[in-house]
């Protein structure tokens, strides 16, 4: 169903092709069709969620498959990160899930502070961040662990490497794969050393 009006969100689909669209997956055209054209027949499904604001501009809200199940609730990481990033002391954040005996998964936040946040008491900041999340999304989305970091592992195009953060949150430091292509490979060791 196509969503009309403004102030709405949903899955981002594209109706018409454009010059740079991928035409196939080498050697597996059927997989290409199943991945991008079966969820919404006749439309290209990007895999992203989007928000159309009050004036009709679109904003990508994150991957729709980037969902963590906590106590039976499906929680998208993008809305939680957006809530955290509203805090005046926060510059950027990334959320991952890690196994929890009771909830199935728990939420682990990696948070980069702005300059004014660096001098604040970190325990109070953790409480304030969780209060903001609880207020905007609900108590179920509160983070179990919040680690303050100086940076996040990113590719040269700026994509956060969540698989690395997930392994750190799980306490699995055995194999991160090739991290030499990261924009800032040294940050991985720093985050490992500060793990909660």
Regions found by a protein language model. Name each.
Residues 1, 48, 149-155:
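Active-site and channel-lining beta-strand-loop segments
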Residues 1-37, 75-77, 173:
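Conserved ATP/PPi-binding loop(s) of AMP-dependent carboxylate-activating enzymes
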């Amino acid at each position: 169903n196509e969503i009309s009006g403004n102030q709405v969100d949903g899955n981002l689909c594209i109706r018409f092709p454009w010059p740079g669209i991928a035409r196939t997956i080498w050697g597996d055209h059927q997989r290409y069709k199943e991945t991008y054209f079966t969820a919404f027949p006749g439309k290209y499904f990007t895999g992203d969620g989007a928000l159309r604001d009050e004036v009709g501009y679109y904003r990508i809200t994150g991957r729709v498959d980037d969902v963590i199940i906590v106590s039976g609730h499906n929680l998208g990481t993008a809305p939680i990160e957006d809530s955290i990033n509203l805090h005046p002391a926060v510059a950027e954040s990334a959320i991952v899930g890690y196994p929890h005996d009771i909830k199935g998964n728990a939420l682990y936040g990696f948070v980069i502070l702005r300059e004014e946040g660096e001098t604040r008491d970190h325990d109070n900041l953790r409480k304030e961040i969780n209060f903001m999340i609880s207020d905007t999304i609900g108590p179920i989305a509160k983070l179990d662990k919040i680690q303050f970091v100086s940076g996040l592992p990113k590719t040269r195009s700026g994509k956060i490497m969540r698989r690395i953060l997930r392994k750190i949150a799980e306490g699995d430091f055995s194999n991160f794969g090739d991290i030499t292509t990261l924009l800032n490979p040294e940050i991985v060791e720093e985050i490992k050393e500060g793990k909660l």
